[in-house]
Amino acid sequence: MNTLKGPGIFLSQFIDNTAPFNTLEGLATWASSLGFKALQIPCNHKHIFDIEQAAGSQQYCDDVKGMLAEHNLQISELSTHLEGQLVAVHPAYNHPFSGFAPQSVANDPIARKEWAIGILKKAAQASARLGLDAHATFSGSLAWPYLYPWPPHNSELFDESFKELAKRWLPILNTFDEYGVDVCYEIHPS
């Protein structure tokens, strides 16, 4: 996609168990009826968009794009906000974030991080298959406990946090680069 030719919408907050919000085609029909031209599609609702299948199947991606085109829609970006957050969870936040991962890795911070990295790398592949050149995600929360500390900021803690972020994110960024997709961080302090 070179230029967005109208408004776009992030689908995540509208996904529900009831029609039309329980399928990608239902969401596409709804969004198109409201005049939207592009969808940002989250990768954490397999029944809406299967990131595993999209990473491995050009046909799946072509089918999704074709269905959206029938509704005069295109994909602006895929998003891995929750998975990106799980790449770098500060230990103080382990419990609150455990619900964002599959039960099999939810309570194991290392396995959860590795699962999230795998999803992000699949999102790079899927983005390339879909012809996308941008991807939306969060960076994690390693430094959040240090944002408003008392006594004043400890630069060593920030340096350590950002070195660790670089260590965790460089392989992911390299994968996106390999597929020609830019990562767009959406930074939230909470």
Annotate each predicted stretch with a short phrase:
Residues 1-3, 30-33, 67:
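N-terminal carbohydrate-binding accessory modules
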Residues 2-22:
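Boundary/entry segment of secreted carbohydrate-active catalytic domains
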Residues 23-45, 122, 129-134:
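Catalytic domains of carbohydrate-active enzymes, especially glycoside hydrolases
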Residues 70, 87-190:
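Active-site acidic/histidine proton-transfer and metal-coordination neighborhood
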Residues 4-10, 36-40, 70-79, 132-136, ...:
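Structural preference for beta-strand elements that scaffold enzyme active sites
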Residues 20-25, 52-66, 114-119, 167:
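Aromatic- and glycine-enriched glycan-recognition loops and surfaces
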Residues 40-69, 84, 139-147:
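Glycine-rich, proline-tolerant flexible connector loops at the mouths of alpha/beta enzymes
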Residues 10-16, 42-44, 80-83, 140-142, ...:
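Active-site beta-loop-alpha junctions enriched in small/polar residues
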